[in-house]
């Protein structure tokens, strides 16, 4: 399986905007922004959440929300406020909010077929 990145822009509450290269990870629920990014766009923590990593380790991180723009869609999304050396990750919750799915075989994003049930 390959590694796929997408270029996007994130915007905070004061309309500060930053371009960011996001790793698309369909196994991760929430989008994560590194500390340098979320501080630059003035995001503020809204709550604490506990997360379990793939190795079983539990970590606590603060969560906020931002406006995200990708080539195929844009909207508000929850984001984990990462630490200094964390990588920017695009998670499934954001993809679903934007109505997108990731095809890991073609390494592309495409519109999802939504069900109204």
Predicted regions located by residue number:
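Pepsin/retropepsin-fold aspartyl endopeptidases
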Residues: 1-117
